């Protein structure tokens, strides 16, 4: 049975590949799990049209992500004020959510906490300057300095 793969499947092929598999494997596993569809002329045309649309959306998302990275790189650094005690230790900590909120406010781009890559995968607990990586899109990263200052009450 000839099918079109809708997902990457080990030892079978990559997304979009036309492969021949046993009919039971296709009918009982691949097609019900939406991992493949029958390779009819109509389905091939539909799949190719969807692929073209997805490629154009991916190119648009890539250019938007590059613009976002350039904007964040132009910022250079952001400042976050927090209450601290003796020797610069913070009362609490600064996490990825706080940094994402500050970057979103400064740049205008919606940055989520999952895009923030903190050093040592930990929260920031002392006053100082930290270099933070931001994962914007597939292979597009941006770097920004986060300056944590003492909040004077």
From Swiss-Prot:
InterPro entries: Ribosomal_bL9 (IPR000244), Ribosomal_bL9/RNase_H1_N (IPR009027), Ribosomal_bL9_bac/chp (IPR020594), Ribosomal_bL9_C (IPR020069), Ribosomal_bL9_C_sf (IPR036791), Ribosomal_bL9_N (IPR020070), Ribosomal_bL9_N_sf (IPR036935). It holds the Pfam family Ribosomal_L9_N. Belongs to the bacterial ribosomal protein bL9 family. Keywords: Ribonucleoprotein, Ribosomal protein, RNA-binding, rRNA-binding. It comes from Blochmanniella pennsylvanica (strain BPEN). Disulfide bonds: none annotated. Binds to the 23S rRNA. GO terms for molecular function: rRNA binding; structural constituent of ribosome. Gene3D superfamilies: Ribosomal protein L9, C-terminal domain, Ribosomal protein L9, N-terminal domain. SUPFAM superfamilies: L9 N-domain-like (SSF55658), Ribosomal protein L9 C-domain (SSF55653). One of its GO terms (biological process) is translation. This is Large ribosomal subunit protein bL9. GO terms for cellular component: ribonucleoprotein complex; ribosome.
């Amino acid at each position: 049975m000839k099918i079109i793969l809708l997902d990457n499947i080990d030892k079978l092929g990559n997304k979009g590949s036309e492969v021949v598999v046993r009919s039971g494997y296709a009918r009982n596993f691949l097609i019900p799990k939406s991992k493949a569809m029958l390779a009819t002329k109509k389905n091939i045309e539909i799949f190719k049209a969807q692929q073209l649309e997805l490629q154009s959306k991916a190119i648009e998302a890539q250019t938007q992500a590059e613009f976002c990275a350039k904007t964040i790189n132009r910022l250079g650094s952001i400042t976050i004020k927090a209450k601290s005690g003796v020797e610069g230790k913070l009362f609490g900590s600064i996490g990825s959510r706080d940094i994402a909120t500050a970057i979103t406010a400064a740049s205008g781009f919606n940055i989520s906490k999952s895009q923030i890559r903190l050093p040592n995968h930990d929260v920031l607990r002392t006053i100082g300057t930290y270099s933070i990586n931001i994962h914007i899109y597939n292979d597009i990263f941006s770097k920004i300095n986060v300056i944590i200052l003492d909040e004077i009450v």
